[in-house]
Amino acid sequence: MAEYDADVPAGIVMTSMEAIVGWLRKTSFWPLTMGLACCAIEMISYGGPRADAARWGHEVFRASPRQADLMIVSGRVSQKMAPVVRQLYDQMPEPKWVISMGACASSGGIFNNYAVVQGCDHIVPVDVYLPGCPPSPDMLIDAVFKIREQIQHWPLMGHMSEVEAAKEKKALDAKTTLEQKGLMR
């Protein structure tokens, strides 16, 4: 339970600015329209009336990376598309988050060849991995709620750039999905 200060009048709520901004950000962020394969169909149905993304404040998918703060990489990423994905990520304003949607985006899926990137974590830092082929809109809703939890506790101003740089370095230095194959044997 919260402690109440006797000096504060009734009806006054005391909180931090980071808590307010975190709450506002998590209830209104803008996903980037970026469908690369069949997972994009499930991502599109996430915005439809059955899943109803508008309940959580993400009713509009943005076509411009400069207006988006959530990238959903849905589907396989070819070697030719990889620089475009990175360029779109770099054009997004800070803070920004990434969901890797589906088996192809997370690990290359069934396409284990030279033409497909074996996981978009080789290109951009990923915050949430969403398994499945293709994952359902309900699974995407769960991933969005995990992102919302991260957004709620994101630092405000000050050391935000250092936190973002550390997050990207940690993600890009981590063991890739290609190196992790065979760990379940």
Swiss-Prot record:
Catalytic activity, EC: 7.1.1.-
Primary location: membrane
Keyword Protein transport: no
GO molecular function terms listed in the Swiss-Prot or TrEMBL record: 4 iron, 4 sulfur cluster binding; iron ion binding; NADH dehydrogenase (ubiquinone) activity; NADH:ubiquinone reductase (non-electrogenic) activity; quinone binding
Gene3D superfamilies, per database record: 3.40.50.12280
GO cellular component: plasma membrane; respiratory chain complex I
Broad EC category: translocase
Biological process terms in GO annotation: aerobic respiration; electron transport coupled proton transport
Localisation per UniProt entry: Cell membrane
Residue positions binding [4Fe-4S] cluster: C38, C39, C104, C133
Keywords, sorted A to Z: 4Fe-4S, Cell membrane, Iron, Iron-sulfur, Membrane, Metal-binding, NAD, Quinone, Translocase, Transport
InterPro entries registered for this protein in UniProt: NADH_UbQ_OxRdtase-like_20kDa (IPR006137), NADH_UQ_OxRdtase_20Kd_su (IPR006138)
Record keyword Aminoacyl-tRNA synthetase present: no
Membrane topology classification: Peripheral membrane protein
Cofactor(s) listed: [4Fe-4S] cluster
Catalytic activity: a quinone + NADH + 5 H(+)(in) = a quinol + NAD(+) + 4 H(+)(out)
Cofactor note: Binds 1 [4Fe-4S] cluster.
UniProt family annotation: Belongs to the complex I 20 kDa subunit family.
Function of the protein: NDH-1 shuttles electrons from NADH, via FMN and iron-sulfur (Fe-S) centers, to quinones in the respiratory chain. The immediate electron acceptor for the enzyme in this species is believed to be a menaquinone. Couples the redox reaction to proton translocation (for every two electrons transferred, four hydrogen ions are translocated across the cytoplasmic membrane), and thus conserves the redox energy in a proton gradient.
Oligomer status and interactors: NDH-1 is composed of 14 different subunits. Subunits NuoB, C, D, E, F, and G constitute the peripheral sector of the complex.
Name of the protein in its database record: NADH-quinone oxidoreductase subunit B
Species annotation: Cutibacterium acnes (strain DSM 16379 / KPA171202) (Propionibacterium acnes)
Gene: nuoB
